[in-house]
């Protein structure tokens, strides 16, 4: 009985992982700046554990957006800060897939 439950949960995890990457690639193809908000809303909707979502998000980002100068994968994040009536859009990068997705980081706090 436990074997079949474990097998079922493993199969469902694989399908969930494939579906997440499909949604991510579609969002990245449409606009790289909207891919991260799509995943944030998806994580809130599914009530998924944050570490699992960070792993799923950072894995394709690290390989799909490489830095062409020194071939170190970089993760790009789009942050929006408002001051008064004007807004300031900035694009930042980091050399590690997990450093820009840390707990309490600017990426998640600014979205």
Curated annotation (Swiss-Prot):
Subcellular location: Membrane
Topology of the protein relative to the lipid bilayer: Multi-pass membrane protein
Single GO cellular component term: membrane
Membrane-spanning segments: 7-29, 49-71
Chief location category: membrane
Keyword annotations from UniProtKB, A to Z: Membrane, Transmembrane, Transmembrane helix
Membrane in keyword set: yes
Top-rank lineage group of the source organism: Eukaryota
Miscellaneous information on this protein: Partially overlaps SSZ1.
Protein name (Swiss-Prot/TrEMBL): Putative uncharacterized membrane protein YHR063W-A
Organism: Saccharomyces cerevisiae (strain ATCC 204508 / S288c)
């Amino acid at each position: 009985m436990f074997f079949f439950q474990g097998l079922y949960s493993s199969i469902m995890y694989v399908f969930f992982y494939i579906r997440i990457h499909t949604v991510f690639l579609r969002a990245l193809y449409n606009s790289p700046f909207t891919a991260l908000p799509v995943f944030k809303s998806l994580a809130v909707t599914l009530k998924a554990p944050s570490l699992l979502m960070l792993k799923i998000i950072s894995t394709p980002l690290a390989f799909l957006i490489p830095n062409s100068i020194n071939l170190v994968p970089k993760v790009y994040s789009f942050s929006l800060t408002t001051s008064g009536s004007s807004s300031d859009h900035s694009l930042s990068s980091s050399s590690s897939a997990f450093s820009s997705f840390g707990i309490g980081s600017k990426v998640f706090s600014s979205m």
